[in-house]
């Protein structure tokens, strides 16, 4: 007969083959919930207030335990991501709010090493449209974190969006006034202002601004086209013949920019001092084509850019003059004027003793007098443009087929 101690001990010992079922350990704060792959938590302002903050204030069950309860003002913003339950670039929290002063209604925005500063005004959060219209269910406030003490804090890129309830929904979570005075003495004042507010924390980056800048610079590079012709519209040239605009360039007829070829620049050819601009000028495409043909006709041997502006200012851009059949170098072309006839101005190239002054080479033209009109609106032959180029554009040539008296 065994001892009672041994029998009682054997009866209390459970069999080895039986397993005790224990409840799972409670989920620790900050651990990620069990969510399906690809799940993203990015609710709208209305969804945050109606489906999360409002239910939290009413102590109703939430759709999913994904928002952690953290007193935000006891931490710096860079410490909060590890306190969150879920999130990658933005994190959500339920947080209480305290008063700054016991007898006031201002919230305390101080944190560990800085403070949160409100920016802008409160944005109302409206519920979806109903039969009675859209109802205001909450407000949203934006805040920026500053390191240091106010008002000389250093601004950071940490942003907070604070959501709080309004109206009847805020009665159970907000105490906007200090405790009343009872029996001639004030009860111990509570610093709690809101039981719960919902906050979204994120760090603003400049990646978006940098991407926009890179795209804009790429578009500018693509807009650089060879043989680009830039001209003012007709309505812009209509009023350029006024007397108050002497000596200024009105039209950039052609700008050819090519880093791999000789630069051919036809800029500032026409000024009001030389010619009178006409409102009926049109179709600069012919002039651009003629200018490009002139480039091939002249074929400058120098590798330096060829600039017509140097020719118009008296710079020596041509080689020493040669005798051409049918031209007389003995004529005094300097005495000729714009009113001379074609017979008087059939002259030749004249270089004064090898100097820098380049006189005009006149082409055989039809009978008639010269008038100051812009050579626009009609196709020009490359030979005509070449003749005008060698003359430095000191005088203008009348071309057949051009209406000089519009």
Swiss-Prot record:
Residues 1-40 are annotated as: Disordered. It holds the Pfam family NAM. One of its GO terms (molecular function) is DNA binding. It is found in: Nucleus. The keyword Thylakoid does not apply. One of its GO terms (biological process) is system development. The keyword Transcription applies. Residues 1-11 have a biased composition (Polar residues). Residues 137-210 bind DNA. Keywords: DNA-binding, Nucleus, Transcription, Transcription regulation. Residues 35-204 form the NAC domain. SUPFAM superfamilies: NAC domain. GO terms for cellular component: nucleus. PANTHER family: NAC TRANSCRIPTION FACTOR 56, NAC TRANSCRIPTION FACTOR NAM-2. High grain protein content (GPC) is a desirable trait in breadmaking and pasta wheat varieties because of its positive effects on quality and nutritional value while Low GPC is a desirable trait for barley malt and beer production. Transcription factor of the NAC family associated with the grain protein content (GPC). Accelerates senescence and increases nutrient remobilization from leaves to developing grains. Sequences of 11 European varieties of H.vulgare tested belongs to the same haplotype while the sequence found in H.spontaneum, an ancestor of the cultivated H.vulgare which has a higher GPC, belongs to an other haplotype. The NAC domain includes a DNA-binding domain and a dimerization domain. This is NAC transcription factor NAM-1. It comes from Hordeum vulgare subsp. vulgare (Domesticated barley). The gene is NAM-1.
């Amino acid at each position: 007969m065994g001892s009672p101690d041994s029998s009682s001990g054997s009866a209390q010992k459970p069999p080895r083959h039986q397993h005790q079922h224990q409840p799972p350990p409670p989920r620790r704060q900050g651990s990620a919930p069990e969510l399906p792959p690809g799940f993203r938590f990015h609710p709208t302002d209305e969804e945050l207030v109606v489906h999360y903050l409002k239910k939290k204030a009413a102590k109703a069950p939430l759709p999913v335990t994904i928002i952690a309860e953290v007193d935000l003002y006891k931490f710096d913003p860079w410490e909060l991501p590890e306190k969150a339950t879920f999130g990658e670039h933005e994190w959500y929290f339920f947080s209480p709010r305290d008063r700054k002063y016991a007898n006031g209604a201002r919230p305390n925005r101080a944190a560990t090493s800085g403070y949160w500063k409100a920016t802008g005004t409160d944005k109302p959060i409206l519920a979806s449209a109903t039969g009675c219209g859209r109802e205001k269910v909450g407000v949203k406030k934006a805040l920026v974190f500053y390191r240091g003490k106010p008002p000389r804090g250093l601004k950071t890129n940490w942003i907070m969006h604070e959501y709080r309830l309004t109206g009847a929904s805020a009665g159970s979570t907000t105490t906007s006034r200090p405790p009343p005075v009872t029996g001639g003495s004030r009860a111990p004042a509570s610093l709690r202002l809101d039981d719960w507010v919902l906050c979204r924390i994120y760090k603003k980056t400049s990646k978006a601004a940098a991407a926009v800048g890179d795209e804009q610079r790429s578009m500018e590079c693509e807009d650089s086209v060879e043989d680009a012709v830039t001209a003012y519209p007709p309505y812009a040239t209509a009023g350029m013949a006024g007397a108050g605009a002497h000596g200024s360039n009105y039209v950039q007829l052609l700008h050819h920019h090519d880093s791999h070829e000789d630069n051919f620049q036809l800029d500032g050819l026409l000024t009001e001092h030389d010619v009178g601009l006409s409102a009926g000028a049109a179709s600069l495409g012919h002039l651009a084509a003629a200018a490009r043909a002139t480039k091939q006709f002249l074929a400058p041997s120098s590798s330096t850019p060829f600039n017509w502006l140097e020719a118009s200012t008296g710079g020596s851009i041509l080689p020493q003059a040669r005798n051409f059949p049918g031209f007389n170098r003995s004529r005094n072309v300097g005495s000729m004027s714009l009113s001379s006839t074609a017979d008087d101005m059939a002259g030749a190239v004249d270089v004064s003793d090898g100097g820098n002054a380049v006189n005009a080479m006149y082409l055989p033209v039809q009978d008639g007098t010269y008038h100051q009109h812009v050579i626009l609106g009609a196709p020009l032959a490359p030979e005509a443009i070449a003749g005008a180029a060698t003359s430095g554009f000191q005088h203008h040539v009348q071309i057949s087929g051009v209406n000089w008296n519009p």
